Amino acid sequence: MTMASDPFSVLGLAADFDVDAREVEGAYLRRAAEAHPDVLGGDDEAAEALVGQLNEARAVLLDAERRANALLALRGGPAKEADKSLPTGFLMEMMQTREEIEDALRSKDAERIRSWRAWAESQRTGYVERVSRLFREGGSHNLVEVRRQLNAWRYVERLIEQMDAGAGCGAA
C-alpha cells in the first residue's frame, strides 16, 4: 500500500482501528489547509490531486468497515478477493434472514422493517466491536479472523442497503 493509498499516512494519523472521528476531521482540516494552491506555490493541479487524496482518506477513516479493510491491508492480512471465508453457518443464516427481510419489504410492513433494521444495526455494532478487539490483540493469526469477520460484516451492510432502498429510507 502506497502512502497515497494509505489513508492513515495521508492524514498523518497512527494506523489504528479505534480512531476518533474528531481526530480524523482535525487531521483532515490541517492537511486541507496545507493543500491550498497558495501554500503549494500556485500549483493548482498538485493541490487538486492532494485534496482528492485527503477526501478519500477522510471518507475511508470515517467508515468503520472501510477503515478495517485499509488497516487489514496495511498489516498484511488477506484481501477479500483472496479469502472469502465466513463464520460457520453464517451463509445459511443470511439466506434465511434475507428472505424474511425481502418479505417484510414486499409487504411494506413498517414494524417488521424497523425490527430488522434494528437487528442489522446491532449486528453491525457487534462486528465493529469484534474487529476492534482482534486488531487490539494483534498477531498474524488474528488477521485471518479479521478478514472472516469483515466478509460477514459486508453481508450485513448489504442487508442494510437493501432495506434502505426498499423502504425508501423511512424504516429507520
Identify what each model region corresponds to.
Residues 1-172:
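C-terminal accessory/regulatory regions appended to core domains
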